[in-house]
Amino acid sequence: MIDLAMCMTLQNEGFGTYGKTLFFGTSPVLDTGSVTNAEGIWVNANTVGINGDLYTDQLTISSRYFDVIEQGRLMLRLLRFVNNRLHEYCRLTCNPIADIDFVSIRVHPATAIDMDAIDGEGRWVKSIRFNVDYKLSPETVE
């Protein structure tokens, strides 16, 4: 659920609107390998490590836009946000969608913007990947 919390953080930072241009738990690349025809930002997480009460997830922020210049600027803004501002957060929350908080956040830097897929018209799905260490709020697990 840290992907939802990241999605809410991106909404609060002005990157889009949840459910319209910001999505979590789905992918712009379909199981057939084809690409969705929607524009927007997708956030997904995979747990890569657990050490006691400390979790490490890899977050993927993907985008697909018809305008490649708009997409390029967006990805640069996202990269700058992840590497220069996200580390200032000590808590990420899923509110108001779900009452789940992630505390003691530590963000590892993102190092690249990757191309994940190309649609039938040559438009790209691009992604930024980075790791986040966190603990669950005690209220979340009760």
Feature map (PLM): residue ranges:
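Small/polar-rich, solvent-exposed N-terminal microdomains that initiate assembly or binding
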Residues: 1-52, 85-103, 141-142
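Short N-terminal helix-initiation segments at or just after the protein's N-terminus
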Residues: 1-8, 66-77, 131-142
